[in-house]
């Protein structure tokens, strides 16, 4: 009997060890960020820096986009015809009708943080933190920069902040900017926000997913 109990104890211990060694489950849409620094300058320090070019970048201002990164996983992302964009937009739920815009990410609302004013066309967005949405209506997408706060966790009773695009209304829009659509010669499986064609005073904010790239130019203001 003692041998049976001892064997059972050993098996229980080994099972617990095996469970402890299993990696944690990965989220369906991992978190990610895109970052860029503008309006700074490269200087030569007294001692060479451990950077490309051995210089130091000083007085730069940060711009960052934080977002959930869904994977395509073989799906038709945007559809066609009358159904274009419907699959990407969140579905409705009791008390939460389907949003008219796309969260352009996954889970928590996509967030833009900027330490410097940004000009999109004729609109200047002050430094601060914003939510990003996209109106997928063709012939071009529209980037929406909104002052709607974001919920860290879904709270249906919190009407002062959004989870994804649920509850979005346009009254807090700070800017609406046309996005140029391009077809990529390859497929991007994981949704990616990026800063492209960058110069010291600005460039383009771009979103890539599948074979679609949507982008819009911006300028950083001193």
What are these regions (language model features)?
Residues 7-16:
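Bacterial N-terminal signal peptides
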Residues 21-126, 131-222:
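Targeting-peptide/extracellular-domain and disordered-appendage signature
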Residues 6-7, 60:
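Short amphipathic alpha-helical "recognition" segments used for binding
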Residues 1-4:
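Positively charged n-region of N-terminal signal peptides that target proteins for export
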């Amino acid at each position: 009997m003692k041998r049976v109990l001892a064997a059972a104890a050993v098996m229980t211990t080994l099972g617990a060890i095996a469970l402890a060694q299993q990696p944690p489950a990965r989220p369906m849409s991992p978190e990610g960020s895109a970052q860029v620094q503008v309006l700074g300058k490269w200087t030569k320090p007294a001692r060479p820096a451990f950077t490309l070019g051995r210089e130091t970048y000083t007085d730069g201002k940060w711009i960052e986009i934080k977002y959930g990164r869904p994977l395509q996983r073989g799906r038709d992302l945007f559809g066609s015809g009358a159904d274009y964009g419907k699959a990407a937009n969140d579905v409705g739920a009791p008390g939460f009708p389907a949003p008219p815009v796309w969260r352009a990410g996954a889970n928590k609302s996509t967030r833009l943080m900027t330490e410097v004013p940004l000009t999109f066309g004729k609109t200047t967005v002050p430094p601060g933190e914003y939510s990003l949405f996209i109106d997928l209506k063709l012939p071009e997408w529209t980037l929406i920069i909104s002052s709607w706060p974001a919920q860290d966790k879904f709270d249906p009773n919190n009407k002062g902040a959004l989870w994804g695009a649920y509850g979005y209304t346009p009254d807090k829009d700070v800017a609406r900017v046309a996005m140029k659509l391009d077809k990529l010669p390859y497929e991007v499986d994981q949704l990616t926000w990026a800063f492209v064609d960058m110069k010291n005073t600005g460039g383009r904010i771009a979103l890539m997913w599948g074979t679609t790239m949507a982008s819009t130019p911006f300028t950083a203001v001193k």
